[in-house]
């Protein structure tokens, strides 16, 4: 078996080896070649050779011999040189003793190695081959030039390692917050710069200005705002107006609770430098529009709150507020309504004072949103709270808080900036820019600063003097008052807190009662003062009016109180008169409930029928609401009592003086109106007497006219007799003086009296010939004609008596 395997391997070797047997020789050198081991046995691994079949190669090297020529042997020797001699360095292979590489070979060219070393190198070769298969094919490179170790060591010693140097940056030119410069070093740097118009000095002054403005704005509050303003004016805020605007807006957005303080600060600066106030307002408007477009509720809330306080300080015009509210409520959602309500709370009182029509339109829009729009419950409650705040007069949201009204009205400057205009927020003012006229501008601002601060000092001194004088005068007046008046001051509470609590207690007692007797018992047990009696009756009536339909519970409760005390009875009588006079203020449902309750009180005789004295049925004295009230009132009475009993009660002789306005008979026009009214509501049976009176009115007028004429004639005759007696007395006195003059006077008087009698008879005859139709037409005006006639007759009688 072994011999066959050896034969197979030998045949394969003959096929692989391209060199023929003719190339081999049997020279003495072949013996040396036989003794020389194969390259594999010498431990070389040349990558240029391909040892594809290592086992067969080993067998050939052991059994077979090479027969090569001189040229082939020379090539073999060149190939068999060490890797180090060929200039290759393989780091994965370890040559522990490179210098002794040549000593390992014996004189006959063989290595003296043990079997273990061969196995170790075999494993190393297999690992190298596997690694080369796994790694990607590398691009072939030419072998590097061979260098000696001495040359490489000398080169390493002559070339030291090169280190990269970091470029040192000027701390002044770094961005904000990038580098901290201690104050001492900053002063030293400023002292070193001699040219104050240079860019470095301007840069340092800009950084100092930025830090100063930012620090002062962050420190401002109600107590120190005056000092902060003076320190701010010490800085060049004209040059740093962009920094000031940015600091104010950032501080306000970070702490919105101090918005009123920042608004007062802006108001003071705006009075001295209006262009700075305009810049801040422009940026605020742009921030609001940006937040509205991005649906950023927080940005809209902060910016709108700042705008509201600037409107209160008269920095911005109220038209801007109306435009913002209109925009927010045009297409309402939860966030926009919330922003609008926050804006209204801050500026509602100012808008109410300045533009009441505009604020009414805004609240009407809010009412429509509350009833029609589908919004969240929380937002609905916010709208209701807003209406309550408006009803209280914005008492928790004053226009300008105490201590911040620091600008005189004549010094205020109001900016008219619409919401929809295009504005430039001038962001270039926020960054440093070299000023070629730096020194001139600094001198100009120093002059402005001196003027402003001098004015402020004079104003403060004047205010201090005036304040000291006022304080001295007040002290003197207080001393005089303390000496003259030793009485204690009484404080009157006009907030009606107790009244609200009392009404709440009554309402809860009414709502928690099962029947009217239990409710009356609870209310009587309450120890409330007598001054609250009318308020109790009003509360019962209000609770009745608030119901959807009339409940008999309230009529029985009111009747029980009317029967208990006379004070309650008088209170309900006064309430009936007040309600009838102001009935036009009630809605139809409330009006119906009130009318039915008072009808119940009259039907049960809890109230006297004398309360109907306030009703006066005529076209001039009634309104649509009062006519509806009377209609429901009498229909309810007719339903309770029936028409016969009601008619009998209205015809009661003892009550007729109280029904003269309800059933008028003084004027046919009013009588006809009352008849038509009761007939239209289905109670025509109550107007029988009125109809008879209207039919008999002409006859009564005729008789009254005749009686008046007879009384006039009797009065004329009595006046004539008086005049004759006067003439007789005068004639008797004149007869004593001269008899001739008395005769002439008596004859004249006789002729005059005869003419007067004839004229009276003719007047009576003419009056009897007048047609009855004319008398009927003149019947309504008879009273006025009678008065005119009496006046004429009295004047004639006086003239006759004089004659």
UniProtKB/Swiss-Prot annotation:
SMART domains according to UniProt: MA3 (SM00544), MIF4G (SM00543)
GO biological process: mRNA splicing, via spliceosome
Gene Ontology MF terms in the entry: RNA binding
Annotated MIF4G domain residues: 210-393
Domain annotation MI: ranges: 501-617
Keyword Nucleus annotated: yes
Biased composition (Low complexity): 709-744
Polar residues: bias regions: 1-10
Pfam families reported for this sequence: MA3
Any one annotated GO CC term: U2-type catalytic step 1 spliceosome
Region Disordered: start-end pairs: 1-178, 451-490, 703-803
Keyword Metal-binding in record: no
Alphabetized InterPro entries for the sequence: ARM-type_fold (IPR016024), CWC22_splicing_factor (IPR050781), Initiation_fac_eIF4g_MI (IPR003891), MIF4G-like_typ-3 (IPR003890)
Ranges of biased composition (kind: Basic residues): 748-767
Main location: nucleus
Keyword annotations from UniProtKB, A to Z: mRNA processing, mRNA splicing, Nucleus, Spliceosome
SUPFAM superfamilies attached to this UniProt entry: ARM repeat (SSF48371)
Compartments in which it is found: Nucleus; Nucleus speckle
Bias (Acidic residues) ranges: 454-480
Paired cysteines (S-S): none
Family listed: Belongs to the CWC22 family.
UniProt subunit comment: Component of the pre-catalytic spliceosome B and the catalytic spliceosome C complexes.
Role summary: Required for pre-mRNA splicing as component of the spliceosome. Promotes exon-junction complex (EJC) assembly.
Protein name in the entry: Pre-mRNA-splicing factor CWC22 homolog
Record organism: Xenopus laevis (African clawed frog)
Gene: cwc22
